[in-house]
Amino acid sequence: MEGKKEIDFSKKFNSLMGENNTYEFFLKMQYVMPKYSKKKDPIFFSFLIFAIEHLAKYKEDESISSLFIQSMQLYLKNHPDKKIENPSYFMNTYHKIYKMIPVKSDKSLFKYNYLELCDANGISEDDILKENIYYEFAVDSRENKFLLEGYKFAMKSMKLDIINDVVKDILETDKYKMDEKEKKIFVARTCLEILVNKDKKMALDFILPFINAKDNYETNEPLCNMAYFICLLLNDKNVTFEKFKEIINMYKPNIEKVDILLKKYINKISFDNYNQLVFPEANNPLSGFNIMGMMKLVGNLSNLMRGN
């Protein structure tokens, strides 16, 4: 028996296919999406890809993001078996759509909406990491010069190559008006953040290019030296908390000049490795410190999220 004929969506919506009708096209897609979201995979995804491809042709990035999120919410609602049990299914769908958006486009809205949808549907951080989503987001943000957004995703990806690339770009640009000392503090903070994420070897590999061992390390920014020595200690299983604290106390005057956040990084690292705190007085809730310390150094929240 002959199979069902594929739907020619371009013929079906021909009157809205012109360049001057993109908004009307988008509204029509929104209107008919509830109907198509009830269809089986081939029809639904054929329709969704048709709509996204047309909007991508005219670089309608916000419309793409909005339509994708709406369509997936409806689809997951109508097909609950696809909801949480198979996160890779949703990831694969995302990949198909994401690659249709022009490379030189602001995909920020798409990224944040996508991550919200993952969270709402029980897709874990581990699943996102396995699919290299954060890495892809970071690469894209960097290519589009949204460096602080790229930094955020690079740090979440925990891939050293993209972390190095984004940090290098941030240090070389005049956009954030950092002097040389602030740049070195930013490097030290990044190293500590990698340690907070519990990758001791990566932290050491990251900080090494910024360390000059000549003249007893005196030509380096003190906080870079501190980050380097912390990495060395943590990579040695025989080092005690007392030795760790001794190194921190050597640099306490330098730490005091930065902000309370640096102490929270050190506390988190100390607690994870030795189950003790170096700065008990700074032990307020540790949530929300990940990117916020860098924000104080290089820009406000809106700049951070949009990379402006």
Task: Describe the predicted segments one by one.
Residues 1-4, 12-15, 31, 46, ...:
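Extended alpha-helical solenoid/rod scaffold regions
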Residues 3-11, 23-27, 128-132, 144, ...:
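Amphipathic alpha-helical repeat elements characteristic of tetratricopeptide repeat
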Residues 9, 146-308:
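Structured C-terminal portions of repeat-based eukaryotic scaffold domains
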Residues 16, 36, 55-56, 141, ...:
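Hydrophobic side-chain positions on well-ordered alpha-helices
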Residues 20, 59-60, 76-80, 98-102, ...:
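Helix-turn/linker elements and helix-coil junctions of extended alpha-helical scaffolds
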Residues 23, 31, 36, 58, ...:
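Sequence-level detector for tyrosine residue identity
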Residues 68-198, 202, 207:
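Eukaryote-skewed repeat-based solenoidal scaffolds used as protein-protein interaction platforms
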